[in-house]
């Protein structure tokens, strides 16, 4: 029997840090914390041989909370978003993948009032990926995928950002991933490389990633990103 598809659930926490709240004389009155929460429900389905489609429904919440002698308890904003994409392997004997995605489609994020609501960063992405190791060696269970991706703003098409990446996959049932990528300069980010690795063992997935360049807004380095998943 053909499976109906796959369903996934994930949660992401972005800790943006804390900041002291001070009076005019510099005395610490309290502490303000900044946290972003993202819950994702995903569904994927093979609609035709060599053609897959996927959909994400996301709930995003941004929280600014204050502890101590605060004028208010903070603010919270919640919004919803959708991602939708398709991936095709048009040639059965050629390890080539093509994909198109529209991401972060949803209502504005409102923290204070409607006039100050922020639109979501809706993006259009198109990518191509090719397995290159087959031209150099024939090691069972080892693949090297090279990917090129263009990303553009949905509301201001015409200035796409280019991303290049590679993923070395080793194993069959239990897998090891080694990843590297490079992205062009964009708003808030310097051009630079990223590295990462991942492990899939039985029902468990774990990944670690690090962007080597810092933010062009703060000058600080990017944090290490850690992900963990369980397949039921």
Protein language model regions, located:
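Outer-membrane beta-barrel porins/channels
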Residues: 1-232
């Amino acid at each position: 029997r053909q499976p109906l598809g796959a369903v996934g659930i994930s949660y992401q926490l972005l800790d943006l840090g804390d900041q002291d709240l001070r009076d005019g004389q510099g005395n610490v009155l309290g502490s303000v914390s900044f946290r972003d929460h993202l819950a994702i429900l995903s569904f994927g389905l093979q609609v035709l041989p060599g053609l897959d489609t996927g959909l994400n429904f996301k709930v995003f919440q941004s929280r600014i909370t204050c502890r101590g002698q605060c004028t208010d308890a903070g603010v919270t904003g919640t919004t919803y978003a959708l991602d939708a994409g398709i991936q095709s392997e048009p040639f059965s004997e050629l390890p080539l993948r093509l994909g198109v995605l529209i991401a972060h489609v949803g209502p504005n994020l409102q923290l204070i009032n409607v006039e100050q609501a922020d639109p979501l960063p809706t993006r259009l992405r198109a990518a191509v990926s090719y397995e290159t190791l087959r031209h150099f060696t024939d090691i069972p269970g080892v693949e090297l995928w090279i990917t090129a991706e263009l990303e553009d703003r949905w509301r201001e098409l015409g200035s796409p950002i280019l991303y290049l990446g590679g993923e070395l996959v080793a194993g069959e049932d239990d897998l090891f991933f080694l990843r590297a990528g490079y992205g062009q300069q964009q708003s808030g980010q310097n051009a630079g490389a990223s590295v990462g690795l991942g492990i899939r063992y039985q029902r468990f997935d774990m990944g670690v990633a690090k962007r080597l360049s810092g933010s062009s807004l703060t000058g600080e380095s990017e944090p290490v990103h850690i992900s963990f998943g369980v397949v039921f």
